[in-house]
Design a protein with these regions (language model features):
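Catalytic active-site module of serine/aspartate enzymes centered on a nucleophile-bearing elbow/loop
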Residues: 279, 283-319
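Alpha/beta-hydrolase active-site loop
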Residues: 93-112
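Alpha/beta-hydrolase-fold enzymes
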Residues: 132-217
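Alpha/beta-hydrolase fold nucleophile elbow
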Residues: 115-126
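Short beta-strand/loop motif that positions the catalytic acidic residue
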Residues: 254-256
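N-terminal cap/lid segment of alpha/beta-hydrolase-fold proteins
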Residues: 13-36
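Conserved alpha/beta-hydrolase
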Residues: 62-87
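Active-site glycine-rich loops that stabilize anionic/oxyanionic intermediates
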Residues: 49-53, 258-259
Length: 319
């Protein structure tokens, strides 16, 4: 097998809005494709964003990747961005996380049919990193690489918290907003940075935090249903059951910021990497970036991370 050539720089790219209908339940899915203009991409990077995220927040990163020969596809998760049945569904995950994972598989299938026979790398950030590992349990053979950014550390309290959110979901189909619970979780992450504002734990760049605060697609209140699915995803991700490991040589990279409160400490990151290695994945690495917080793709020194991702992709064998 030959390896993908060193990625070439090209400042021209094409951006395409993509509308899909979920095969799972017909939910409208809003996606975005950013690809090199005038040449065939050397890889496809599929992005699974985090909680309260949306695909547009990754545009600078996707443009950079496309400029270096990597096509990017990203889809708003159900209950996020514009992947909604109605406007009031923002913060509500209709169909649950199983539907979300099948939506991700649908985007992979679209990428395979559109780009033809080039490596597909999945990048999951935060909640997206949980979804990516649940995806991996079923579909690891579809991927040529996996990148897990801002992975939440395993939390032994998740199982107990599921009982609370499960109870809340008994009422109004789990659509009740949970501002106090959401604020409590965020404040715990923000303890170290409280003097800088309520979202300082997310990123050290005030401009990034201001964008999140002022954008209605990223500043919204979660429902009991969304929190229940998030916790359920954590439990499912860190369960050693259900892993087929059909692609044991798959390159897997954990990438986190040194000051990422969601990580729960460097030991938990390395424990997550060791777990995957123990399951039978033979090419698992973990890297921690100094002076960076949760959103390493948006930090002030983000191009360090972007270039490491390009390097990771450039070493993936071509098909």
């Amino acid at each position: 097998m030959k390896c993908v050539c060193p990625l070439r720089v090209n400042t021209f790219f094409m951006k395409t809005d993509l509308q899909l209908k979920s095969r799972y339940d017909g939910l409208p899915l809003s996606a975005l494709v950013v690809e090199p203009d005038g040449r065939t991409p050397e890889a496809v990077l599929q992005i699974a964003h985090g909680l309260c995220g949306c695909k547009e927040r990754y545009m600078p990163f996707m443009e950079y990747m496309a400029g270096h020969g990597v096509a990017c596809v990203a889809c708003d998760h159900r209950g996020h961005g514009r992947s909604l049945r109605k406007s009031g569904d923002l913060g509500y995950m209709e169909g649950g996380y199983s539907a979300l994972v099948e939506d991700m598989k649908q985007l992979t299938d679209w990428s395979v049919s559109h780009f033809h026979n080039i490596p597909i790398v999945l990048l999951g950030h935060s909640m997206g990193s949980l979804a990516a590992r649940i995806y991996l349990k079923k579909y690891d053979w579809e991927l040529s690489g996996l990148i897990l950014s801002g992975s939440p550390g395993n939390n032994n309290m998740a199982q107990a918290a599921i009982l609370l959110t499960g109870f809340l979901c008994l009422f109004n189909e789990g659509r009740s907003k949970q501002p106090r619970l959401q604020e409590y979780i965020s404040s715990r992450f923000n303890k170290k940075f409280s003097s800088e504002g309520p979202l300082a734990w997310v990123c050290s760049d005030p401009a990034v935090r201001n964008e999140m605060m002022t954008d209605p697609l990223t500043n919204f209140t979660l429902t009991a249903n969304m929190m229940h699915n998030l916790l359920s995803m954590m439990v499912r991700t860190y369960s050693k059951q259900g892993w087929a490991v059909l692609n044991p040589e798959l390159p897997v990279a954990f990438l986190s910021g040194e000051d990422d409160a969601v990580m729960g400490g460097e030991k938990k990151l390395h424990d997550a990497a060791k777990m995957m290695a123990g399951l039978g994945y033979n090419n698992v690495t973990a890297a921690i970036f100094s002076d960076m917080r949760h959103e390493i793709l948006n930090e002030t020194d983000k191009e360090i991370v972007w270039n490491d991702i390009l390097d990771f992709i450039s070493k993936i064998p071509s098909k």
